[in-house]
Amino acid sequence: MAAVLTLAASCSIKEDRSPCPCWLSIDFSRCNRSSVTVSAWGEEEIFSERVAVQDYQESEIYEKTVPKGFVNTSVITGEREMKRSGARLIIPMGHDADSIYAHASTVECFGEFAQDTAVLHKQFARVFMSVEIPIGHEYPYTFQACSDVCGIDIRDLSPVEGEFKIDLKLDEENICMFCLPRQRESGGNLKLLIYEGNEVIETIPLAEWINQMGYNWLKKDLEDIYVGVDYAKAEVSISIRGWDDGYSFKVEI
């Protein structure tokens, strides 16, 4: 009797099928990560769950029913410190971005079946900074990176505006590395602040200088950035990984 009731509640061939849900399939065959967070959005969130990719090794297909219409799909991996707030993934103050790889797409789910293929792309830029200090000199300055982008919208991988700030600590070789989230196309208000004690003595307009090099914040996979600070020459240099040329800028330190 239960089976009969279930059948009666579903869509039959003779019925108007427009209210029936759509089966959304997401192909994981190009997703070479151990686990991902899969989400879908219509006017509001439809579902979001953590998935072990290995559980889908045989079929390589993840399936869910969704309401008919346009559906935004999101597949993300690499979350560590960043926190979900609705459709946004936010960087906590004082931290850098997580190493996020992600896929986002708008799928037309108007029929009985729809399909998407998850292809993960690099949503962060590693910034490697090295400081040249003459032997026998003690470096009197500290650094802070700041921006007006504090996260990512998982529905379309666009930047989320908000305060981003991290104190940079040099290692024993006077090198540090931090991760930036995808910035706005212009680079926004990305800056490197140089402090002497509690006073900012120099502001390096990283966004402006990086843009002068032709860096593209809209690329699917963001490139890494190298910043060199030469204390003796009072010079800052910027280069992009894999590029032959770089830029050097004089600063008054």
Residue ranges: model-predicted function:
Residues E79-Q115, N198-K233:
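Structured interaction patches on ligand/partner-binding surfaces of diverse proteins
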Residues V127:
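A surface/extracellular/periplasmic glyco- and lipid-processing/surface-interacting theme
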Residues V227-I253:
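Eukaryotic extended interaction platforms
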Residues V4-N32, G246, K250:
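Bacterial Sec-dependent N-terminal signal peptides
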Residues S25-S39, S130-E138:
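Structural motif
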Residues V36-R84, P140-Q212, V251:
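Tryptophan-paired
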Residues T117-F124:
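Conserved "repeat-terminator" motif of extracellular CCP/Sushi domains
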